[in-house]
Amino acid sequence: MIPLSHGLGITIILFALGLLGMIVRRNFLFILLGLEIMIHSAALAFVVVGAYLGQEDGQIMYMLVVTLAASESAIALALLLRLHRYCHTLNVDSINEIVE
């Protein structure tokens, strides 16, 4: 079994990478991917803490979070397709200019 600090360190690194991906990239699809990485890293933290405490609650929460992330992803991709058909771009800055 891996130590708690190593598991939480990996989740923090994944969360930071997702946040960095959301901040740096201006493409709506990459922002969505960064958000998904952040959600899954938070869910992984549930599993790590649950394994450390010897409880199955972390794995149950992980399944719940993955289910919610899948539904959120499906809705976001539908909005992304609609946005691309309307604006012909996925660049967030260009979309902000069109709205103004």
Curated annotation (Swiss-Prot):
Keyword terms, alphabetized: Cell inner membrane, Cell membrane, Membrane, NAD, Quinone, Translocase, Transmembrane, Transmembrane helix, Transport, Ubiquinone
Membrane topology category: Multi-pass membrane protein
EC number assigned by the record: 7.1.1.-
HAMAP family for the chain: NDH1_NuoK
Gene Ontology biological-process annotations: ATP synthesis coupled electron transport
Molecular function GO terms recorded: NADH:ubiquinone reductase (non-electrogenic) activity; quinone binding
Transmembrane segments: 4-24, 28-48, 60-80
PANTHER family: NADH-UBIQUINONE OXIDOREDUCTASE CHAIN 4L, NADH-UBIQUINONE OXIDOREDUCTASE SUBUNIT ND4L
EC main group: translocase
Reactions accelerated catalytically: a quinone + NADH + 5 H(+)(in) = a quinol + NAD(+) + 4 H(+)(out)
Subunit-level organization: NDH-1 is composed of 13 different subunits. Subunits NuoA, H, J, K, L, M, N constitute the membrane sector of the complex.
Name of the protein in its database record: NADH-quinone oxidoreductase subunit K
Gene3D superfamilies assigned: 1.10.287.3510
GO cellular component: NADH dehydrogenase complex; plasma membrane
Protein purpose: NDH-1 shuttles electrons from NADH, via FMN and iron-sulfur (Fe-S) centers, to quinones in the respiratory chain. The immediate electron acceptor for the enzyme in this species is believed to be ubiquinone. Couples the redox reaction to proton translocation (for every two electrons transferred, four hydrogen ions are translocated across the cytoplasmic membrane), and thus conserves the redox energy in a proton gradient.
Organism: Blochmanniella floridana
Location in or out of the cell: Cell inner membrane
UniProt record similarity statement: Belongs to the complex I subunit 4L family.
